[in-house]
Swiss-Prot record:
Modification after translation, per record: Phosphorylated in response to DNA damage.
Localisation: Nucleus
GO molecular function annotation: 5'-flap endonuclease activity
Basic and acidic residues bias spans: 562-573
Oligomeric form and interacting partners: Forms a heterodimer with SLX1.
Top-level taxon in the UniProt lineage: Eukaryota
Keyword Cytoplasm: no
InterPro entries per record: Slx4_ascomycetes, Structure-sp_endonuc_su_Slx4
Protein family per UniProt: Belongs to the SLX4 family.
Name used for this protein in its record: Structure-specific endonuclease subunit SLX4
A cellular component term, taken from the record's GO annotations: Slx1-Slx4 complex
Chief place where the protein resides: nucleus
Gene (UniProt): SLX4
């Protein structure tokens, strides 16, 4: 039977190829189904528990339906529209994030749910203390209160992490001040800001403790770790208890033993304890603070000698720092000037400087201190003639201390004190060299005769400096010299031979005194510098210019040049070149002295740079004879005689006639005004007011007699008469002013706008139109320009 079936199957396979293809397709489908089942079984172990199991059943049913379906062509289904990813509201975002899908209204029903919802929203907007803890610490100083330094708080107190508006404003201001160069992206990064703050804190710690720094300079400049005590210093430097108390290695006994040798000062500032206040002042010393700081205080010992026994009297050691004092406006000649600046704080009160009474003054001698700023070397020189010094305090200042009184009681006997007839006087002098004092006197006063010189001279071969005295100067000695004065400056390097005597402001009775010589050279008399303005004019044709007077400020020089020959083949001759002087060219050079300030200003304001030496080409007019233009302008007296005797503004009859004509112009019609313009030869304008204004201004330059005569004459004759009268009036006023006359005679172009303003504001008092001025200049051959 099996054999029969095998034969039947083989017959089927060989029966038709179509049947064989269908069979292979079914076999492939069955294999795919088996593979799909195996894959599903493998993926079941990854299936979620809550997932509905209907999905697998649906897949199996779909596979069965696909088997039964015919292989017919079906239309593709349309894709479903995608849901728009819209921005969710804040409440929905909070519900999904913190409320686990529950609506906010459902949570409101129970108190616990409502509290959880609020805390969840607060936690979303709250900051994290582990990230901005450093910023909160800095906000404490702004708010002046402390925050809790606990770690992550409990849920009940979660709302305390929220920041108020003031807190956030302070944080933003703090960040912008500390980090002004942050970009918009890094400004919101709290981690970046926290790292920056930590770096700055570390740098501040390094600067406060330079030994922590690895640089050699920071380690070398750092103070020692351990400070020496008084016992350590006493053992290290073999000091006594007295030296430890006084903080100095100089003792009074050392000064008494050796008068000539100056002891040295040992400073222990690097190893001394710095806990003591620097502002405290020892009672035994009177310290005056200086406005300009010095490297270290200078110890100075004051010495004086008795006139009889010449016994040295050591006063005491003082730390002296000069301070500018307040002077009275009225001085008696026993004080000195101080050129130092005022300091802010006063180290010693005025009570520490008691004024010496007149009966207790004693004569003390001294030399002037000479200190070099570079190496503090002091040179001892022979005492020269004492110099006069003015003071501003009514009484000298005595430096009082316990050591001074103690020194006086030990070394000075009562008999020596009684031998003095006058009291001692102590004056602190300014450290100025004796050879360079007051070499340039500028003023002398009567009180300068009885002026004491500086009683101290500083001398020492090494630092510190001490004062030593060499000689005794009595109080009644005259120390006023010819070369010194109360008011003076630094030493001048000019020779005395070139100085000029200065008359004294006060009259002295002493006939031996001479005039004070000034070290400044004699002032030379001021010589006014002459300024000349030169210009050149190039004129076609021959022009003859008469020689002017040598005393005149205007000099005209004619330079004759020949015209270059014209090539008749290549160039066409101009009609203007034909004439008598067709082969000549005149160049006029005008030199005028400029002595007025207005002339210089006008030359600088000239926009065409006519103040420079330039060449201006002026073509000759064929209607006017240019052979002697300059002479006709300068020597024309006929025009002056025609109107020189008339006074327009001062004649009452003329003023009345003008007033009548002014009224007549206002009453005239436009037609009559145009006829008057034509009669006078004026250029017609538009507007009745403008016509009345021009006629009124022009009428000021025309006499009434000429107006009456012109009415009987024909049109051309009347125009010529009025025009001549107007031009003569303008020429009369121009010849009265030297500035305009020089310009016209030197062929310099005049500005019509400036001439118009000058005629309106000057003696003429007439504001003419530029057209009339242009015709006037053209008529008389005056060069002009209309540039404003």
């Amino acid at each position: 039977m099996s054999r029969l079936t095998e034969d039947s199957i083989g017959d089927i396979n060989l029966a038709s190829t179509q049947m064989q293809g269908r069979l292979e397709e079914f076999d492939e489908i069955s294999k795919e189904e088996e593979n799909m089942k195996k894959r599903i079984e493998r993926l079941r172990k990854f299936k979620n528990i809550d997932t509905n199991t209907n999905h697998t059943i649906g897949l199996q049913n779909e596979n069965l339906e696909n088997k039964n379906k015919d292989t017919s062509i079906t239309k593709p289904k349309r894709r479903s529209k995608r849901d728009n990813n819209r921005i969710k509201s804040l409440t929905s975002l909070m519900e999904e994030t913190y409320n686990k899908g529950k609506s906010f209204q459902e949570l409101k029903q129970s108190k616990l749910g409502q509290k959880d919802a609020q805390l969840s929203i607060f936690q979303y907007f709250s900051g994290h203390k582990e990230k901005i803890g450093d910023i909160l610490k800095r906000i404490e100083s702004i708010e002046k209160r402390k925050l809790e330094s606990s770690d992550v708080p409990e849920i009940e107190h979660e709302s305390r992490i929220l920041y108020t508006k003031k807190e956030w404003t302070d944080i933003i201001k703090r960040i912008r001040l500390r980090f002004p160069e942050l970009s918009s992206r890094t400004k919101k990064s709290l981690k970046y800001i926290t790292n920056k703050i930590q770096i700055q804190n570390q740098s501040q710690l390094i600067s406060e403790y330079p030994k922590n720094n690895s640089s050699i300079w920071s380690q070398a400049s750092a103070p020692p770790d351990t400070e020496f005590t008084d016992d350590d210093l006493k053992w290290l430097y073999d000091l006594t208890s007295e030296q430890i108390i006084n903080e100095s290695t100089i003792l009074q006994n050392d000064l008494e033993e050796s008068d000539n040798e100056t002891p040295f000062v040992m400073t222990l500032s690097q190893v001394m304890n710095t806990t003591k206040s620097e502002d405290t002042i020892d009672r035994e010393f009177d310290v005056i603070s200086d406005s300009s700081p010095e490297p270290s205080p200078i110890r100075v010992s004051f010495c004086c000698r008795d006139e009889q026994s010449d016994k040295a009297l050591h006063l005491s050691e003082q730390k002296i720092q000069v301070k500018n004092s307040i002077y009275d406006p009225e001085f008696n000649g026993n004080e000195i000037f101080s050129h130092q600046k005022d300091s802010v704080e006063t180290a010693v009160s005025i009570e520490s400087f008691p004024f010496v009474q007149s009966g207790q003054r004693e004569s003390i001698t001294g030399d002037i201190a000479e200190i070099s700023e570079d190496n503090f070397q002091v040179s001892e020189t022979a005492p020269r003639q004492p110099q006069a010094i003015h003071g501003t305090q009514e009484a000298p200042i005595e430096i009082s201390s316990s050591s001074i009184n103690r020194g006086k009681t030990n070394l000075m006997s009562e008999e020596d004190r009684a031998s003095h007839n006058e009291a001692e006087e102590v004056i602190i002098s300014s450290p100025i060299k004796d050879s360079e004092l007051f070499k340039t006197p500028t003023k002398r006063t009567p009180g300068s005769k009885n002026i004491m010189s500086s009683p101290f001279r500083l001398h020492c071969n090494s630092s510190p400096l001490s004062i030593r005295s060499n000689s005794v100067t009595p109080r009644h000695e005259r120390i006023v010299s010819e070369e010194s004065s109360a008011y003076s400056t630094a030493r001048s390097k000019f020779k005395l031979s070139s100085a000029q005597p200065i008359p004294s402001q006060y009259q002295f009775d002493d006939s031996e005194e001479e005039a004070i010589f000034s070290s400044m050279p004699a002032r030379q008399a001021y010589k006014k510098r002459k300024v000349y303005h030169t210009s050149r004019l190039l004129i076609d044709g021959g022009l003859y210019v008469e020689l002017m007077n040598e005393n005149s400020k205007v000099k005209i020089k004619t330079i004759e040049t020949k015209r270059q020959p014209v090539d008749s083949e290549n160039e066409i001759r101009d009609s203007e070149d034909e004439g008598e002087h067709d082969n000549s060219l005149s160049v006029i050079e005008i030199t005028r002295e400029v002595d007025d300030t207005d002339d210089l200003v006008n030359l600088g304001r000239n926009p065409r740079n006519e103040n420079d030496t330039s060449v201006l080409q002026v073509p000759s007019s064929p209607q006017i004879d240019n052979s002697n233009v300059l002479g006709s302008l300068y020597t024309s007296q006929a025009a002056d005689s025609a109107f020189g005797s008339e006074k327009i503004l001062e004649d009452p009859i003329r003023s009345n006639a003008l007033e009548l004509t002014q009224d007549e112009f206002n009453n005239m019609s436009t037609k009559d005004l145009k006829a008057k313009f034509q009669e006078w030869g004026l250029k017609p304008v538009k507007g009745k007011e403008k016509m009345i204004q021009i006629l009124s201004e022009t009428n000021k330059l025309v006499s009434q007699s000429q107006l009456n005569d012109s009415q009987d004459k024909p049109m051309t004759a009347s125009q010529h008469t009025i025009k001549t009268n107007i031009y003569n009036r303008i020429s009369f006023h121009l010849k009265q002013d030297q500035y305009w006359l020089d310009k016209i005679l030197s062929f310099e172009p005049i500005n019509l706008c400036m001439l118009q303003e000058w005629l309106a504001s000057g003696s003429a008092g007439v504001k003419l139109e530029t057209d009339i001025l242009e015709k006037y200049c053209d008529e008389l051959g005056i060069t002009y320009t209309d540039i404003k």
